[in-house]
């Protein structure tokens, strides 16, 4: 009769090692992601004031009131983020294509040029655009010379300035995923398309662009998500009439001290972005995001 082999439990031998390696990440996520989200969710269902204190009353009216009172800011956040994402894609795709296929030994240098301005803070970059778009600046002068801006017209404190600032601030978030996706593309596939008498335009839309879709999806997500919650660009490049939801949340949290409304707005914005992202990824037909 052969001896029965010992049973291996969860903590026997090295079976526990994967769980031990997973534990620090789980603790980090639980402490710095799950806990703040749950706290924000709890705050959004409270009522009261900073003087009398807040208490949890499951006040779902905070959500309905927040949505109906700030519909314009909701729509503006989605609109500005969408425009900035589209502009970033139009600007960055040719740039990423050139770096991936034409830059040769200058690839690393060009990538450094793309990211170098972003070694400075977000705030400083935004303030630089305030100088660039100033009424006495060269950009306004060029626009007026070309007849794109009437005499006395201005770019600063307009929706144009806000969208331009958002687009600029998130360009690397679009460029780098696109470059990574294009750089991995097998060039022989493009050559094969040419051998089959496909012109450059046909080869691009039939081969290059579809194969680079993971980079397009990743870039648009990395751009749209932070852009929708941005409030710095409106504060320095726009006016209250261009305010986005991030500006309202900032004001409610730090100025008005209306924590339940601010929390409800934050949760609603997160849920809206999550739904839009889910629909976009499903529509794009890819889950392989680089």
Predicted features and spans:
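Transmembrane alpha-helix signature in integral membrane proteins
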Residues: 68-101
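Short membrane-interfacial helix/loop motifs at transmembrane-helix boundaries
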Residues: 4, 33-70, 132, 136-137, ...
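Glycine-rich helix-loop "coupling/hinge" segments at transmembrane-helix boundaries
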Residues: 52-56, 231-257
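Transmembrane alpha-helices
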Residues: 24-27, 32-33, 116, 168-187, ...
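N-terminal signal-anchor/first transmembrane alpha helix
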Residues: 1-39, 108
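Membrane-interfacial helix termini and adjacent extracytoplasmic/periplasmic loops
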Residues: 7-11, 126-167, 201, 237-241
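Cytoplasmic-entry segments and transmembrane alpha-helices of multi-pass inner-membrane transporters
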Residues: 22, 95-132, 190-191, 204-205, ...
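C-terminal transmembrane helix and the adjacent membrane-cytosol boundary/short C-terminal tail
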Residues: 2-5, 9, 46, 179-190, ...
């Amino acid at each position: 009769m052969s001896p029965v082999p010992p049973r291996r439990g969860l903590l026997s031998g090295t079976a526990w090692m994967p769980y031990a390696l997973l534990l620090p990440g789980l603790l980090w996520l639980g402490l710095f992601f799950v806990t703040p989200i749950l706290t924000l969710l709890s705050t959004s269902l409270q009522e009261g004031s900073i003087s009398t204190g807040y208490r949890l009353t499951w006040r779902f009216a905070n959500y309905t009131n927040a949505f109906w009172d700030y519909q314009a800011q909701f729509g503006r956040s989605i609109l500005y983020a969408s425009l900035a994402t589209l502009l970033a894609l139009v600007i960055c795709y040719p740039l990423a294509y050139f770096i991936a296929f034409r830059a040769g030994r200058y690839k690393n240098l060009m990538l450094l040029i793309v990211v170098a301005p972003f070694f400075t803070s977000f705030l400083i970059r935004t303030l630089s655009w305030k100088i660039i778009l100033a009424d006495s600046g060269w950009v306004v002068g060029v626009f007026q010379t070309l007849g794109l801006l009437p005499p006395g017209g201005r770019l600063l404190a307009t929706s144009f300035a806000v969208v331009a600032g958002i687009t600029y601030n998130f360009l690397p978030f679009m460029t780098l995923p696109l470059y990574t996706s294009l750089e991995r593309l097998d060039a022989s596939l493009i050559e094969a398309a040419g051998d089959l008498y496909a012109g450059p335009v046909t080869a691009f839309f039939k081969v290059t662009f579809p194969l680079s879709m993971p980079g397009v999806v990743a870039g648009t997500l990395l751009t749209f998500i932070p852009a929708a919650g941005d409030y710095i660009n409106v504060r320095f490049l726009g006016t209250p009439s261009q305010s986005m939801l991030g500006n309202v949340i900032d004001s409610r949290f730090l100025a008005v001290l209306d924590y339940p409304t601010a929390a409800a707005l934050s949760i609603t914005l997160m849920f809206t972005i999550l739904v839009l992202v889910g629909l976009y990824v499903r529509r794009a037909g890819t889950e392989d995001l680089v």
